[in-house]
Amino acid sequence: MSICSDNWIIEKCLKEKMIEPFVDKQVRFENGEKIISYGVSSYGYDIRVSNQFQIFTNVYGSIVDPKQFDTKSLVKIEDDVCVIPPNSFALAITLEYFRIPENVLTICVGKSTYARCGIIVNVTPFEPGWEGYAVLEISNTTPLPAKIYAGEGIAQVLFFEGKEKCLYTYAARNGKYHRQMTLTLPLL
């Protein structure tokens, strides 16, 4: 596997709609104001977070159980800014919809702007053949409240192209998060 360049990303997005909406450059300003960048970079794509968030709460005394997830553990927020409480965690969804080619695997890493503020973004790999909006897991590791800006960059996706197609794509395995259109909570 080798990492894919901006040329490859642009070509796949223009010809195969791998990312929609797609921005073929780095955007660092909007309406004359600095923002957290998004769009194509040298060897990746900086994704944006939508305005749909769910923050974990302990109001109902729930236990987080991935096998029997209790939606009372979360508070829904739809806003241009999400404030994550100290040492807390939020889920969000990307603005971009992805269609991953059958010989490609992605890895997503956080942006340094947020990382230097103690905000860690975790996203599991986008597997070959997967498509959908990506769910983002965002941790505020600081003892202070932390802001997340909707519509701005949140993480970078790196694309790795295999020498051959895999035997079973995510779609062929009927992956449980295939074609997710909303902020999907844990499924078994």
From Swiss-Prot:
UniProt key word Nucleotide-binding: yes
GO MF annotation list: dCTP deaminase activity; nucleotide binding
Binding-site residues, dCTP: 111-116, 135-137, 156, 170, 180
Keyword Disulfide bond annotated: no
Reactions this protein catalyses: dCTP + H2O + H(+) = dUTP + NH4(+)
EC number: 3.5.4.13
A matching Pfam family: DCD
GO biological process per UniProt: dUMP biosynthetic process; dUTP biosynthetic process; nucleobase-containing small molecule interconversion
InterPro entries: dCTP_deaminase (IPR011962), dUTPase-like_sf (IPR036157), dUTPase_trimeric (IPR033704)
Active-site residue list: 137
Metabolic or biological pathway: Pyrimidine metabolism; dUMP biosynthesis; dUMP from dCTP (dUTP route): step 1/2
Alphabetical UniProt keywords: Hydrolase, Nucleotide metabolism, Nucleotide-binding
Signal peptide: none
Top enzyme class: hydrolase
Biological function: Catalyzes the deamination of dCTP to dUTP.
Family, per entry: Belongs to the dCTP deaminase family.
Subunit record text: Homotrimer.
NCBIfam families membership: dCTP_deam
PANTHER family from the UniProt entry: DCTP DEAMINASE
Protein known as: dCTP deaminase
Species annotation: Protochlamydia amoebophila (strain UWE25)
Encoding gene per record: dcd
